[in-house]
C-alpha cells in the first residue's frame, strides 16, 4: 500500500454512557494519530434509532473534553468529509447499496421475522447463506417483475450481502498478525433495511471509512469476527487498494480476569466504569471518574497501560511522552485485567506531580462544603505539606482539617496515652514560652522550644505529644512546628489554652 496520511476515527453509538473500554480505544486512536501527524475523526454511528438515548452524544463529547482527547474533525468539529452523523448520510448509503445490487454483490430479501424464525425451527443451525438463500423469498429466487411489484406495494425488505462460499478471507491485523477465516461460516449479512431507510453498521462503517479516507481502523477485539465481512465488502466495492489496516485491541477484563469488564463489576467492587457520572432518564445514577475525584491525567495514564507496554519500566508518563512512545505493535493480544487499585495509585502519583496551587484550587470546593474560608496562600501551604498522604483531593480534608478548624473534642485514646499528669502544667509553661517567641518561623520556634525543653529537663516526646494533642485533637499530623507555623502564634496559643481547660 502506498504511503498515505494517517487518518483514524472513533465512532461511538449514542446509546448511553461511554464505557471506559471505549475511552481506551479512543485514546489509542488519538496517540496513533498524533504520533504520525495524522487526523482523528469523531463520527456518530446512530443507524439504530431504537437504541438512541437523548444526551448520550453530548455526554461522550464532554467526556473527551475533560480527558484532553482532542478531535480534528467530525460531529461538532466540522470538516471536509461530513456529515459525520450516520443518520444524516441516508442518500449516500442508498447510492452504495444500489452499486452492490447492480453488480450482483447483494440482493433484496422479503422474508419476514416470522418466516426466518420458522426456518430456524425447521433447520438446525440455520443461517442465511449460499446454501439456504435459494429456498427463501428474495430477488435471487423471484423474477424482477415480482420484486418490483412488492416494492411498489410498500412491502418491507432488507438488502443482504451475497457472500460466495468456501473462500479463505485474509485479515492482516497489526496486533494479531494474519487472521484467516473461511467465508462458509459467514452468513449473508443484512446491509440495509427499507423500514427506516438506513444501513446496518457494517455497510455504513465501510462506506464512511472509505469516503473519509480512513487509513487505520483501531477498534476493540469484539469486532474481529466482523473483519472478514468488512474485507469482503471492500473487495465488492473494488476498494482493496485503499482498504485501511486493522488493529483489534485486547478486551478489558474483570479485575479477577474471568470475563469482560462490566458496570456490575464496578458496582460490586466500588469503582467507576464511566468517565463522567451518568444520569439517564431512568434515574439510576452511575458514578464517573471525574466525580469520584480522579484527575484526567491519571485516568489517561492508567488506561494507556491496560493492554499496551511502552517497552520500558516507566509507568507515569505525560500525554506527550505517551505519543512519543506509543507503538500499536506493542499492544497485547490477550485481555488486560482492570486493576482498579492501580488507577488509585496513578491518581496519587498525579496529585504529587501537580503544582500545589492547582491542587489547592481543586481543594477549595471541599473546604467550602465544610464551611471553611481560608486565605489561598494558606491552602497552598497546607496542600504542599499534606498531599503526599492522599490519593484523592477530597481525602485532604480528613488529613488536614485541623489546619482550618480547631478541635471540638480530643481523641480519647490519644488523651489516655499521651496526656500525662503534668501535661496541663507543662503546656501552660510552653504557652508562655511560645508567646515570647519573636521569630515564629519553623526554625525559630524549634530552637526556642527545644532549648526550653533541654533547660527544664523535660522528656521531649511527652512535651511534643501533648503539644500535638492541643493543636490537632489527636496524635496525627506533620512536623509539630509546621503545624504551629501555619496556624500562627495567636491561634496556637488559643488552642493550647482551650485544651488545658478541657483536659486538666
UniProtKB/Swiss-Prot annotation:
Keywords: Aminoacyl-tRNA synthetase, ATP-binding, Cytoplasm, Ligase, Nucleotide-binding, Protein biosynthesis. ATP binds at residue 263. PROSITE patterns: AA_TRNA_LIGASE_I. CDD domains: GluRS_core. It is found in: Cytoplasm. Pfam families: Anticodon_2, tRNA-synt_1c. Its EC number is 6.1.1.17. Belongs to the class-I aminoacyl-tRNA synthetase family. Glutamate--tRNA ligase type 1 subfamily. This is Glutamate--tRNA ligase. It comes from Bacteroides thetaiotaomicron (strain ATCC 29148 / DSM 2079 / JCM 5827 / CCUG 10774 / NCTC 10582 / VPI-5482 / E50). The lineage of its organism: Bacteria, Pseudomonadati, Bacteroidota, Bacteroidia, Bacteroidales. The gene is gltX.
